[in-house]
Amino acid sequence: MLRHVAATWEAQGHRVVVVAGSQDWPDADVAILHVDLTVIPEEYRRGLNRFPVVVNGAALDISKRVVSRNLLNRDDAWTGAVVVKSNLNDGGVTEQQLAYSKSAHRPLLPGEVAYVPRPATYEIFPSIRDVPDSVWESNSSVVERFLPEHDASGYSVRAWIFFGKSERCTRWRCDEPIVKATGMRDPELVPVPEELRAERRRLGFDYGKFDFVVHDDRVVLFDANRTPGAPPPRNNTVAANAHLAAGLDEFLK
């Protein structure tokens, strides 16, 4: 998504430089921390002080154990359904690719992708006692209360995308409790709950996407992403990304 937003900045006359790795960073008025890892490595953190402004400079850990307010332990008294997820963003695929690259003693070549099995779909269990011991014993998994948004029209999921003060918040419908992009339909713009703005402040986000639901009038944040993807540009998305790009202005003051 940021690539599409940056195209608007360039059209406005801003110079945008994309830098890979943690060395040879140019001087800049604003730096955007855009590293697709759940936890930002120390070598990146050390370099941030050289810039006067760092977008997402405080959003250093987006693991489920940091983001979620619905984590469970095996001895909790929760009696409802639960869902098992990876603690790492996107099932830790990027971390596994990085580990492959290091084990091969070379970076991945342009266009080369390490074979990493996609993470299994979130698993829903009727109760805590149905969760296998292997999950509780794993540091890579978390167990959360399963709190879907559901009404007579089916299930819903909401996404709040923001850059500074520019934002859009959309709700999609779906027939399944675990909402997938291919099954999302009937998008509609909805207000951003104040509780979600508080979560953004807690997590230190300036730019990103929050996936959430409203369950029994309660806002439930289940994913926070500082490197969101985007569908192929269309007329409506181009306009939306141009609106998002306006959020840069507050960081240039």
Please place each PLM-identified region on the residue numbering.
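A long amphipathic alpha-helix within ATP-dependent nucleotide-binding catalytic cores
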Residues: 146, 170-221, 225, 229, ...
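Conserved N-proximal alpha/beta basic substrate-recognition cap immediately N-terminal to
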Residues: 1-102
